Structure formats: C-alpha cells, structure tokens
Amino acid sequence: MEGMRRPTPTVYVGRVPIGGAHPIAVQSMTNTPTRDVEATTAQVLELHRAGSEIVRLTVNDEEAAKAVPEIKRRLLAEGVEVPLVGDFHFNGHLLLRKYPKMAEALDKFRINPGTLGRGRHKDEHFAEMIRIAMDLGKPVRIGANWGSLDPALLTELMDRNASRPEPKSAHEVVLEALVESAVRAYEAALEMGLGEDKLVLSAKVSKARDLVWVYRELARRTQAPLHLGLTEAGMGVKGIVASAAALAPLLLEGIGDTIRVSLTPSPKEPRTKEVEVAQEILQALGLRAFAPEVTSCPGCGRTTSTFFQELAEEVSRRLKERLPEWRARYPGVEELKVAVMGCVVNGPGESKHAHIGISLPGAGEEPKAPVYADGKLLTILKGEGIAEEFLRLVEDYVKTRFAPKA
C-alpha cells in the first residue's frame, strides 16, 4: 500500500524498523508519572494493545530513571516487547550516566537540542548522551521543538536576518532556527561517530502550514528518517483535524517514517485515542491497513429512514468486535472494505467498489437491498432481517476471501 517514499537509512528501535521501505510506524507517549511503575506499565500495555508500535515515556528525575528497568521487566513478563523511548530534557546526561540499567532498558533516547543547557555546557551534555548511546548501540531521536529553541541560536539567526537587504519576518526566522537546531545536532552526532542507522530526526511546531515547511526542509537537508507530529495539536475535533491537515501533505509526498498524534485527551477519553487517530490517518491515505473499513453515505432527503445509519454503526461495531479473531485466522483481513449505502443514487456503485456492500432502499424506493461482492450482484435482501443477513454475508465473505492458502 506504500507509495513513493523518501529514501532513508533504516533505524531499528528495538525490533521495529523506522525508515527505508518499512511501514510508517505509529508511536504514542504515556502521561503517567514514570516513577509510578504500576500505572505506567498499565498504560504502556494499553497503548501497545491499541496499536502503538513504539511508546515514549518521560525520564525526568531519578525516581523515573529507577523505574524504567522494572517497567521493562513487567512488560516482558506479559510477553510484550514494545520498544520504550526515554524522553530527556535538562538532565538526561546526568541520568543516563548515573543509571546505566535505565539506559540499557530503553530502546531509544530522545534528545531535545534546546534543553541541553547553554554555551559549552550544551555541547558537553549532548556529546555525553551521544557517547552513551554509541556505547550501548542505542538509536537517538534528535527532537527539536519550537517551544524550547536554544535562545543563542535564535539570536544568531535574528542578527543574521537583520543584516539582510530584505529581512524575513520574525516567525520565518523562528522556523529557520528550528530546522537549523535539528540539522546542526544531527550533523554533530554524525561527526561524533553515531551511525546514520542510529539517527531519527524531528522538529515540531503547532501550526499545520509551518510543520509542512519545516519537514520539507529537513527532508531536503538530511537523509535521516523523520518522526512526524504536530506538537500540542489540541483537544477533540480540532486536534484531530489539525493533525490530519499537517501530516497528510507530507505523508503523500513520501516524507515521514513514523508518526505520533499529540492530542490533549479529555477526562472522558482514553489515552489510546491518539493511537486510533494516527492509524486512521495512515489508513485514509492508503499507506497502511489496520482494520476493515466501512464506507457509508452521510444521508440526505432521499434517506428518510435512519436504518442505513444504524446498520453502518452496527457493521462497524461487529467488524471491530470480530477483528482480533479474524486477524489471527485470516491474513490480510485488515484490507476488507465494506459499503453501507442509503439509496439508489450512489449505493450500487459504491457497493461494487467495495469488497462487499449493500445498497439500502431510500425514500419511495422499492423495499429491497441488493448486496454486491467483488463488484457483482450477490443477492437481494428483503424484510425485517436485512441487518443480520448482511452481517452473516460479511462473515461468510471473510471466511472465503481471506482464508489461508493451502
């Protein structure tokens, strides 16, 4: 399902490959205090079971550092080998040096070049973290963020901009500084001897247009696999739409090797929502398939009944319910496309484009529902049992279409 991808080295984070021709990986991050081993382990398991292929956790103090090996041990005891990424700011060099078991337990280090200190201390702290990564054979994500830019670098670029015949806006210079911060750290790590197969790069902002510009620049200036994400995307529909709007143009250009959707969860929503949204973005773009899809129309004046809406909802629920068993028994079932349409205008055509689809009668239409499979009329359903009959047909189709080859 992959389109043309920007060529990069492959970086292994644990057993998960990032970059090259490998599928775009979905990441997430815990929001529990890492020092709370029980809560953090439970959330990592929850995120992983929802589909997160890599999970990041903050390592912000000594108690968090001490907790990491035990979190890893408990995950392995559950048979879960999801890679863990340590997120370091301000004191990462100290923690990695003092707690070697923590460093060994992590599968990748995230280093923010804007939170390493100032002046020569910044370079020393960065070099120490890179040396530890090299000694342990760990990959590193150099992750810059416009909310924590190095003020010295920003001042340097602002001064340079002021001497231009036609200075750029302050906002443009901030974006340039963000890219420069990431690229300089990337080049410094390479000069220290960290291999290209151990480096991932990111530079995050909170506006969609800015993110597209920044990542096009990173793609132009480096060969590194890129971690995409709109930082502080926000809550609910706004956060989902902003993330999709920011990531889609880049992904369609072949830019991006792993993604995270940084939603602010509402108190009523699970942390796994960000994983679900990331998967939906990749699936909507045709880049990966995680679960069967249901295509359904929005309804109009021709669809006076809510039956097609109820059926679409029930089909979606049933597919989600059956997916764990289907995935184990029927390879490729994630590619399944089901159509539930509300009237004769687009119903038959959309149903023919799906693997299996039903075109329900609209207002004033004859009370019958043709079902199509692989583009051909399979049967016509009538009466009160249309919903259950269609669900049975979907089940039969899966068993036939996706049965393992003998």
From Swiss-Prot:
Biological process according to GO: isopentenyl diphosphate biosynthetic process, methylerythritol 4-phosphate pathway; terpenoid biosynthetic process
Keyword annotations of the record: 4Fe-4S, Iron, Iron-sulfur, Isoprene biosynthesis, Metal-binding, Oxidoreductase
Protein's name in the database: 4-hydroxy-3-methylbut-2-en-1-yl diphosphate synthase (flavodoxin)
Organism: Thermus thermophilus
Lineage: Bacteria, Thermotogati, Deinococcota, Deinococci, Thermales
pH dependence statement: Optimum pH is 7.5.
Enzyme class name: oxidoreductase
Reactions catalysed: (2E)-4-hydroxy-3-methylbut-2-enyl diphosphate + oxidized [flavodoxin] + H2O + 2 H(+) = 2-C-methyl-D-erythritol 2,4-cyclic diphosphate + reduced [flavodoxin]
Binding residues for [4Fe-4S] cluster: 297, 300, 343, 350
GO molecular function, one term: 4-hydroxy-3-methylbut-2-enyl-diphosphate synthase activity (flavodoxin)
Record's function text: Converts 2C-methyl-D-erythritol 2,4-cyclodiphosphate (ME-2,4cPP) into 1-hydroxy-2-methyl-2-(E)-butenyl 4-diphosphate.
E.C. numbers: 1.17.7.3
Pathway as given in its UniProt record: Isoprenoid biosynthesis; isopentenyl diphosphate biosynthesis via DXP pathway; isopentenyl diphosphate from 1-deoxy-D-xylulose 5-phosphate: step 5/6
Alphabetical list of PANTHER family matching this protein: 4-HYDROXY-3-METHYLBUT-2-EN-1-YL DIPHOSPHATE SYNTHASE, 4-HYDROXY-3-METHYLBUT-2-EN-1-YL DIPHOSPHATE SYNTHASE (FERREDOXIN), CHLOROPLASTIC
Cofactor(s) required for function per UniProt: [4Fe-4S] cluster
Record note on cofactor: Binds 1 [4Fe-4S] cluster.
Gene that encodes it: ispG
Superkingdom of the source species: Bacteria
Family: Belongs to the IspG family.
Activity's thermal dependence: Optimum temperature is 55 degrees Celsius.
Gene3D superfamilies found in the cross-reference section: Dihydropteroate synthase-like, Sulfite Reductase Hemoprotein, domain 1
